[in-house]
Amino acid sequence: MDKSSTMLVHYDKGTPAVANEIKEALEGNDVEAKVDAMKKAIMLLLNGETIPQLFITIIRYVLPSEDHTIQKLLLLYLELIEKTDSKGKVLPEMILICQNLRNNLQHPNEYIRGVTLRFLCRMKETEIVEPLTPSVLQNLEHRHPFVRRNAILAIMSIYKLPHGDQLFVDAPEMIEKVLSTEQDPSAKRNAFLMLFTCAEERAVNYLLSNVDKVSDWNESLQMVVLELIRSVCKTKPAEKGKYIKIIISLLSATSSAVIYECAGTLVSLSSAPTAIRAAANTYCQLLLSQSDNNVKLILLDRLYELKTLHRDIMVELIIDVLRALSSPNLDIRRKTLDIALDLITHHNINEVVQMLKKEVVKTQSGELEKNGEYRQMLIQAIHACAVKFPEVASTVVHLLMDFLGDSNVASALDVVVFVREIIETNPKLRVSIITRLLDTFYQIRAGKVCPCALWIIGEYCLSLSEVESGISTITQCLGELPFYSVSEESEPTETSKKIQPTSSAMVSSRKPVILADGTYATQSAASETTFSSPTVVQGSLTSGNLRALLLTGDFFLGAVVACTLTKLVLRLEEVQSSKTEVNKTVSQALLIMVSILQLGQSPVSPHPIDNDSYERIMLCIKLLCHRNVEMKKIWLESCRQSFVKMISEKQLREMEELKAKTQTTHAQPDDLIDFFHLKSRKGMSQLELEDQVQDDLKRATGEFTKDENDANKLNRILQLTGFSDPVYAEAYVTVHHYDIALEVTVINRTKETLQNLCLELATMGDLKLVERPQNYSLAPERSMQIKANIKVSSTETGVIFGNIVYETSNVMERNVVVLNDIHIDIMDYISPAVCSEVAFRTMWAEFEWENKVAVNTTIQNEREFLDHIIKSTNMKCLTAPSAIAGECGFLAANLYAKSVFGEDALVNLSIEKQTDGTLSGYIRIRSKTQGIALSLGDKITLKQKGGS
């Protein structure tokens, strides 16, 4: 058995105390010096020292002391020292302390009595405890409750010892009498706990005979009652009906802790709708009444579990759950929205959307903290609602369009993506959305939002008035043409500065950015700078949002403007009968495109135009100069069809994910069927009937069958030594979120007893041992289990290595068996996750740690290699299947996963097929921490060749 520590004392390792110094201080008369010496002795014991020479000194000079602090430290010392020899027999000198303990138990001071009784709770040696039993019993009748409550705990601990029931034969009966007469709440709780632990039937009888008084009992006693109920119902499930009534009565208790435990107990014991509804209501009430954010997060976790198991009941409480949005904490709000979005139905969608709209309006005030981020969460939630239930889109789309000009770019981007999807899925809203978009387009200031808004204008302006308004809006936002004066460009800069004052403009710095398909391009990050005004037409920077963005060097936007104008002109040909008007508009569009090219090639622009944007604008110019039916069809129909296909694929993916979440359970054909209507209902309450029905349903559908998956358990066993070694060892590794539990089975294969056998472990990486190794004795050809816990603090590949050290009677030297290394796999800590394209790009730009792994594989098919990497890294591919379908010689995809510590792992895979059939390219891993980037890179390097 591992020894448990009951205390934690700081110890400064830099100044170890010497045993002789401690001995001198203990022999003196100075009380403070004795206290200090006792503390040093205890610290040495805690750190593995034995110091046996101090025992007699302490018996002679410390034991007689009347000082309370010294007496308390003495008990700590006695708890720590070894009281038995190697054979497990009590050391003879330990009898010396019995008389002192007896005196303490009869001491006139109640504190001395109480701490001595508490000390006896931790004594495991029957020989020491046995002479003290009469004195312990006398303390049950002491006038002070502190003594009585510790006396009850001491009796319980002694009764639980091997043969302890012989020391206190009638202990349960005695404690039951104490329970009926005791007035102190803590002593009463301890008495009930003793009955529950040592004589469960008596505890049950006492509880059932006092059912009406349970709600008036003390909080600590009510908590033990709930613990008893859980224990009894586990062994006797048929009787849980009468206990559930007690739990429901406790739901009205004044203590939040009791109410929370009641709800948890109800859920664990019953599947009846009434019980689940009561538990869910309790969690919702606590969610509103508790101010601690950690408590709120725990309650939301409980509600999430209920939502998973009992969605139909949780649907009724969706508005109660949403009230948690009143908390200013973003984590609480995010969890609340995640739960609520899974509970939306046709019946509650309008109510939910109204509540979300109110929250969006609240974010417009400057009072709330992190308004932009919260607004973004709300917009995403409303987007999800509108996609599931298109009928509500009309009530929210116009409200959200007010935020297209939001200073929070991510929030504005979410709005424009929402509008783009709604205008396609809700054709009835097309006219009103286009009208509103054209009216508010000038407010959009973000370079990432404008292209999407322009695409919507180009695709969905269908009537003559809409097309003309679209062209007019774009022209106004571009301002006067050209973008700079050619004549003024050649003038000396010094003269120019005197003629006109300088104007500030937005200039961009460029850095690599990952596109939607996973390839790299250049991203412009706007920053303010100054231009000489003579080269820029006066007033140009304030005349329109598109103009301001173009002057920063954002020529990707210029290419989008050209494409949008091209689509609008081509559509104008279809709806405008006057050729003169069409030609006039064509000329205007060509002038705009040529001006953008001119700006891109001039020294006025902070950056020259990139080749992609230049070629795109040139294509638009050629198309407007030489229009034909085939190209017209591609521009006006094919682009829209691609978007429709993308939306359909997204909806299909979401449906598949929803189906995957829904776990189906199956019953065996020969399972018994219990017909509810043929059962006796006599004396059963409605709740008991409901509970029985739910149990029958679960049994019928196979939900009671739990597959322990023993084969998987066997796969986790690692052999640590060879079969020919004198000591054979194997470990079963259980990986938890924050620690690793090792269960090492050690077998003595020799004919001798192994003494002082010790499992010595060490770690490499971000792993830490949390306990000191213990010494054991192992009989010939016997086995034992040694447990070790290792703390994990980050997602990083670690190694556990060590030895088994032992002694035998024949050989004086210690024998060492070296163990095989245990490698802790990063895959145990990361799981596939989903995030939006925008969130992926944002994280990719922010994360500083990148690990670039060159592709080196024997696999020759791009898609096969991607699937192999996904399987090897336990990540989710965010790139749509249509984007990586087909054979084109190259492939780019984004992968995403999340660790149990909340760390994000981003992977971009870019590969190309060479002429000889081999694959080349790079896999880039980015994360906020170095550990996950390096560990994942090592894993990919190991696995990419197609190894297991």
From Swiss-Prot:
Record membrane topology: Peripheral membrane protein
Name of the protein described by the UniProt record: Coatomer subunit beta-2
Keyword Coiled coil: no
HEAT repeats: 49-87, 92-126, 127-164, 274-311, 312-349, 391-428
Any single GO BP term: intracellular protein transport
Alphabetic keyword roster: Cytoplasm, Cytoplasmic vesicle, ER-Golgi transport, Golgi apparatus, Membrane, Protein transport, Repeat, Transport
Species name: Arabidopsis thaliana
GO molecular function annotation: structural molecule activity
Compartments it resides in: Cytoplasm; Golgi apparatus membrane; Cytoplasmic vesicle, COPI-coated vesicle membrane
Function: The coatomer is a cytosolic protein complex that binds to dilysine motifs and reversibly associates with Golgi non-clathrin-coated vesicles, which further mediate biosynthetic protein transport from the ER, via the Golgi up to the trans Golgi network. Coatomer complex is required for budding from Golgi membranes, and is essential for the retrograde Golgi-to-ER transport of dilysine-tagged proteins.
Pfam families given in the database record: Adaptin_N, Coatamer_beta_C, Coatomer_b_Cpla
Subunit architecture: Oligomeric complex that consists of at least the alpha, beta, beta', gamma, delta, epsilon and zeta subunits.
SUPFAM superfamilies according to UniProt: ARM repeat (SSF48371)
InterPro entries in alphabetical order: ARM-like (IPR011989), ARM-type_fold (IPR016024), Clathrin/coatomer_adapt-like_N (IPR002553), Coatomer_bsu_C (IPR011710), COPB1 (IPR016460), COPB1_appendage_platform_dom (IPR029446)
One GO CC term on file: COPI vesicle coat
PANTHER family: COATOMER SUBUNIT BETA
